[in-house]
Amino acid sequence: MLDELSYKVLTNLETSYERKQPLGSKLIDRYTLTIDQSTVAQQSYFEQIIPAINRILMNSEAHVIDPDNVLIRLLPEILSHLSFEQILMYYPNDFILHFLFEEKLENVSVICLEVILLNLQEPETLQFLRDNNVISRLLREVYFKKTPISVLNKIERLITVLNGIEEINLLESCLPILKKIRDQGNTVLLSRYLDLVNLLLRYLPEFSPHLYSFTKQEFLKYQDDPLFLILLIQFYVKLVRLKAPVDLSLPLSDILSLYDKFDLLVKNEVVELVAQLSFTQSYTDILFKSQIFKTHNLLEVFEKTENSDIRLLSKANPQVIYELNNSIYPDVLAHLNLFTNNLYFPILLNFMSSTTIFYQLKLHLNNEKLSQLPMDKLFKLLLEMSTHNHSKEHLFNNLPTIMSTNLLETEDLRNNELWNLKLEILQNLLNDDSVPGFEFWHQELTRNYELMTFGRVFRNAAPRVDIIDETA
């Protein structure tokens, strides 16, 4: 005898199937959250619930009966209490293979993949994958069929979690398929291909460079398909960020050599790539050879309109920029209205972290100049200064008016964003007592921080801060 809630769900499944009417989604979602070992231990539980679910999933009217896909959430929760061997009693090998590769009902395919995922660590599951060449066949579904997104996501999830030695061996059969896709040059298929290669590179050290190294000629060719070219550059951004165990020097050098040939949208993605490279020591040599930070390659920054050079100086590692162009301050930064032009202000914030450039900038970081900034800009600048010891020292020792008036004053800030910025600034200023000048301000900083954190009720009110447009 089933408990009351299980019986209610079973009745709803059977009635909805017979009448071809929508399930009680809220009922089933609530039930999914309650399933535990005591639920599934009820006599004949699996024998009643699973067939009732299967009848709906395999019915041609499944989209009518289960419009919210609640069964796709319910069934995995039930199956998680069974071993792979037990699951095969309800979903035999032939059933799984049939609905993965022959009769493709989207929801049933998703369930079959979920069955594999739930039991991937079991020897029987690995044997099933091996004996039936499942991984390789799934890849063919990805690249040669119109695979639904939900199924594609499950396939990619399956490949992502293959991390044992035996499991990785299963992936080796994928390489011939990947090579075929790579050589076809179909950008629709290559878009999926890039995601998969990104997953596999960490597992297959013998990966052929041809599979991940696109050529200069290909980059030029794909200019006719800028959306794919953006995806391709994002692919390299991910590989650099994840420190993929492969040599990317050649494709990265080719991308940078074509920087000026790309349109603005693509150049903006290259900026993201350059920024990532600048924070990765092993690729500094590529940036040096490209000369992308040399003054003659940054002339667009003076145009006072949004452009990729401004983004580049706002995002890349400022210390690396300086190391590759020692004249960056006198040649470029000194000629920009970093404080008053909104386009250039992110460049100022970025270069706060460079000790070398900061000592050239700090002559302009005085009480008078900072006091003239709108409050939103001032607090963003102070937040950046509060994250580096060299700029904290300058704030403590050379900006007493800013400290007293803007950070230690007791007047309520009625702008939510500014209030949160101030709280974060105070937290940062208090996190290192070794900074020269800290002791002088310590007591007042602590008092204000505690007052904001524990003793003041912040009332969300209309902003009273004047933010003016200074892009001219």
Swiss-Prot record:
Chief localization: cytoplasm
Protein name: DNA mismatch repair protein HSM3
Keywords for the protein's UniProt record, in alphabetical order: Chaperone, Cytoplasm, DNA damage, DNA repair
UniProt keyword Transmembrane present: no
Lineage: Eukaryota, Fungi, Dikarya, Ascomycota, Saccharomycotina
Family statement: Belongs to the proteasome subunit S5B/HSM3 family.
Pfam families per UniProt: HSM3_C (PF18794), HSM3_N (PF18795)
Gene: HSM3
Signal peptide: none
GO BP: DNA repair
Listed InterPro entries: HSM3_C (IPR040752), HSM3_N (IPR041335)
Oxidoreductase is among the record's keywords: no
Subcellular location: Cytoplasm
UniProt function note: Involved in DNA mismatch repair in slow-growing cells. Acts as a chaperone during the assembly of the 26S proteasome, specifically of the base subcomplex of the 19S regulatory complex (RC).
GO cellular component, one term: cytoplasm
